[in-house]
Every structure is written in structure tokens, then in C-alpha cells.
Regions:
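Short amphipathic alpha-helical/adjacent loop interface patches that line ligand
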Residues: 16, 38, 69, 216
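Hydrophobic/aromatic ligand-binding patch that stacks against planar heteroaromatic rings
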Residues: 47-48, 101, 193
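Active-site phosphate-binding strand-loop segment of PLP-dependent enzymes
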Residues: 63-145, 150-152, 156-157
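Hydrophobic residues in well-ordered beta-strands that form the structural core
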Residues: 30, 36, 57, 109-111, ...
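Conserved coil-to-alpha-helix start sites within the AMP-binding
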Residues: 39-45
Length: 238
């Protein structure tokens, strides 16, 4: 929460759990459609299928491998309930255009930022100013808790709903005798051991991000003049 600047953030057992919660908060139900991308790890789309919704793949921009917002606009219909964008390999999607689509069609955009902790768009950290953003803390991510993730939401209401759904629908600030479960929840909470690992890892985040950026620049520099190799085109304002 402190790093991203979003007080409505909560830790979960895995980034996949964070995506599932985001889809439920967005109101995705069986029979709905969710626009997504094939350029991602399997859980992005299998989690959509787990809600009973149909996955609709938008086109990928061949210059950067990211979901093309203009393709997405053409796929929206009365069954479309949400759009899932993936900031693949830390490269941020064209959120200016996706936010415009969200406004025009009143459809929420869910940001899969499993690869993008620390990435920015227009000077703002991803997750600081959007309705739903999920992050992964799995073993090979920038920060790891061995396995884990967290969800950032845009308001107190969604935060409270996610907090209850994260733990069987129970409010852990109350005793079991005081609880009255209103919605079914899950065992999606992060345990104290993995959380402690994550807190220590956060001390080194800037150093780790710097190393990733340095490695990326190294590859770009040494691959750019090789015949048949095309480098990715980074998004503007990222």
C-alpha cells in the first residue's frame, strides 16, 4: 500500500486469487463475456473461465505483444462484463485508450500487473489509480513471498467486499459468534510467514527493478543490429 500509494490493497495467497476476486467484484457471472489476451500465462484466462464467463480474445499488437485497445472496442457487446489487460513483461498497455473504452461503455478494466510491480503510466505507479489491479508475488517475480499476490481496488466498498471474500466471508475483526456471513468467500488469505518474507523483499525492490531495467537495455543494445530480430516497441508515457 505504501509503495504503490493505494490504501485499498490487500494481500492474498496468489495473484490468481486476486484476479478471481477482481472478476467477482466487477460482477462477472456465468454467461457473461470477458475480453482478454492470449499473450499471458494460463491463469489469466482459466480464472475467467472459472467464473462461468466466456473468454473473448482481442488482437495483440505485434509491435509490443500487448492487447490492442482498438481491437477490444470492436468486440464489445451486451454480454461484455469486463476487460482484462495484461502488462506483459512489465510493459504497460495503452491505459489512456483502455480507460476511454471503460468510460464509453461503462465496463471495468481489470489490470493484470503480475509482471509490472513498479511500472508507471503517465508518471503514476500501476495500481495506484484504477478500479482493479492484481499483482503476483510468486517465486520468479520482482518481489517474492515464495507464493502470493495482492489486489489493489479503487474504493472502500470494494476493499471491504474483497476483505470478506478473502476469508470465507468472515470478518476477522469480529469473533465467530458476532459474524453473520452474507456472501460466500474463499480461503485466499496470505499467512504471516510469507508476508514476513515479502516485507523483507520490499527493502530491495528498487535495486531489483534497476537490475531488470539494466538487463533489458543490455539485450536491446546487443540485439538491435541483428538481421531478422525486431525489438519490442515500448508504450508511450511508461
Amino acid at each position: 500500500s505504501k509503495f504503490i500509494g493505494n490504501p485499498f490493497s490487500l494481500a492474498v495467497h496468489a495473484g490468481t486469487d486476486a484476479l478471481h476476486l477482481a472478476l467477482l467484484l466487477a460482477g462477472v457471472k456465468p454467461g457473461d463475456e470477458v475480453i482478454s489476451t492470449a499473450m499471458t500465462a494460463e491463469p489469466t484466462n482459466t480464472t475467467i473461465a472459472m467464473t462461468g464467463a466466456r473468454v473473448v480474445w482481442g488482437d495483440v499488437n505485434p509491435r509490443n505483444g500487448l492487447l490492442d485497445p482498438f481491437s477490444v472496442r470492436s468486440l464489445i457487446n451486451e454480454r461484455t462484463k469486463a476487460i482484462v489487460v495484461v502488462h506483459y513483461a512489465g510493459m504497460v498497455c495503452d491505459m489512456e485508450e483502455f480507460n476511454r473504452i471503460a468510460h464509453d461503455f461503462k465496463i471495468p478494466v481489470i489490470e493484470d500487473a503480475a509482471h509490472a510491480l513498479g511500472a508507471k503510466f503517465n508518471g503514476q505507479l500501476i495500481g495506484s489509480n484504477s478500479p482493479y489491479t492484481l499483482f503476483s508475488l510468486q517465486a520468479i517475480k520482482h518481489v517474492t513471498t515464495v507464493d502470493g499476490g495482492f489486489l489493489c481496488v479503487g474504493n472502500q466498498k470494494d476493499y471491504e467486499k474483497a476483505r470478506l471474500k478473502r476469508w470465507f466471508g468472515l470478518d476477522k475483526t469480529k469473533s465467530r459468534l458476532e459474524n453473520d456471513i452474507q456472501e460466500v468467500g474463499f480461503k485466499y488469505g496470505m499467512n504471516n510467514v510469507t508476508a514476513t518474507i515479502g516485507l523483507v523483499q520490499m527493502r530491495y525492490l528498487e535495486e531489483v527493478l534497476g537490475r531488470f531495467i539494466s538487463n533489458g537495455k543490455y539485450y536491446d543494445e546487443h540485439l538491435k543490429n541483428i538481421s531478422g530480430v525486431e525489438l519490442v516497441e515500448y508504450s508511450k508515457n511508461t
